[in-house]
Each structure stands twice: as C-alpha cells, then as structure tokens.
A protein has these predicted regions:
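Σ70-family region 2.3-2.4 aromatic/basic alpha-helix that recognizes the −10 promoter
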Residues: 28, 33-36, 46-89, 97
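DNA-recognition helix of helix-turn-helix
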Residues: 136-173
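A short, charge-rich alpha-helical start-of-domain segment used by transcription regulators
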Residues: 2-33, 116
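Acidic, proline/glycine-rich intrinsically disordered inter-domain spacer in sigma factors
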Residues: 86-109
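Short amphipathic alpha-helical boundary/capping segments
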Residues: 9, 102-112, 139, 154
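Hydrophobic positions on the alpha-helical face of helix-turn-helix-like DNA-binding modules
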Residues: 52, 119, 132-133, 143
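Short amphipathic alpha helix immediately N-terminal
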Residues: 110-131
Length: 177
C-alpha cells in the first residue's frame, strides 16, 4: 500500500507519525495480543501498546517499509523494559491472565517469563538467537535453553490439548501475521 503523506524531512521514504498511528489503529488487536502474550497482564499489555505508539511516533525516523515490523518491535521492547524477563528466576511463574482469552493461548501464558519472551520473539516473530540475546540482555545459551524449555512445555500442552480436541498451531497465526 502506497502512502501519500510525506515525512517532515521532505523524504517519502520515512514513516511519519501519521503512518504509525494508522498502523497501530489497523493492527490494534494483534499488537495488544503481542503485548499480552509477553506480559501476561492486561494493564501492562495496554501500557506496552500506548508507549509503543508514543515511541514510534516520536522516535527516530524509520523507513516506511519497516514501519509495521518496527511497531511490533516497539511493543516487544516496551514489554522487555517492563518485565525484565532475563532477571526473573526461572522457578517464578507469572499470575495468569484473568481476561477471557483463547484457550489455546493459555499454554504460552503459562510459560516462565524468559521462556515466554524467547518463544514469542524467536518462534512467532522470527528474531534470531543473537537478536533475542541482545534485546533480552542474556547470553545466547540462555536464549537457546529457554527456547528448548518453551517448546518442550508447549509440546506437552499440545499433546494434552490434542486429547481434548484443541490445537495450538492455529492460535500462533493470530499473533505472527
């Protein structure tokens, strides 16, 4: 889709505040769900959304082609800043979301914070091990181990879900599109 609005510096190559406002409006549900999967808290997910929008609009120029992925990255960065998942002990579990949520998402929400962040960033969003490591502030090995634990947990949940006729795979597409 070609945008006709030109950024303040005169170059149509960069996304404008209006472009980001449109993206956050059009993708509100997906961006909020991304924040919710990361924070497991409705208020924090909303805060990620609001701060992500504000930082996208007021932040450094971004190429227009990158604006949608940049919006998603801002949500992830806000969630990391709020939750500090690499500092959370692996044995501490987050209180479950009390909202009405897709039952198939519960397995993701039940992951420990670092596992959940790595799963969402690496598997759903396509970040590399290195990107996850840098953004989360932990070693690459910690990312690899967290991914392994997350996939094992989700595989077990999928087996249980299969017994009940539920599947996780279709749910992941809600977030990753």
């Amino acid at each position: 889709m070609q945008l006709t609005h030109v950024s303040q510096n005169g170059s149509g190559a960069y996304a404008t505040g209006g472009d980001f406002e449109r993206i956050f409006s059009e993708e509100m549900n997906r961006l909020y769900l991304l924040g919710l999967l990361l924070t497991v808290d409705a208020r924090k997910a909303e805060q990620c959304f609001v701060e992500g929008l504000g930082n996208s609009v007021e932040g450094n120029p971004v190429f227009r082609e990158w604006a949608r992925s940049w919006a998603r990255r801002r949500i992830i960065q806000e969630a990391i800043r709020m939750m500090e998942p690499a500092k959370e002990k692996l044995t501490i579990t987050t209180e479950p979301v009390t909202l009405e949520i897709e039952p198939r998402l519960r397995a993701i929400l039940e992951l420990d914070a670092l596992e959940r962040f790595v799963f969402v960033m690496f598997v759903l969003e396509g970040y590399s091990y290195q990107d996850c490591s840098v953004l989360l502030g932990c070693s690459r090995r910690a990312v690899v181990n967290a991914r392994t634990r997350a996939l094992e947990h989700l595989a077990n949940a999928a087996e249980i879900g299969a017994l009940h006729g539920e599947g996780l795979q279709s749910t992941y597409s809600l977030v990753s599109n």
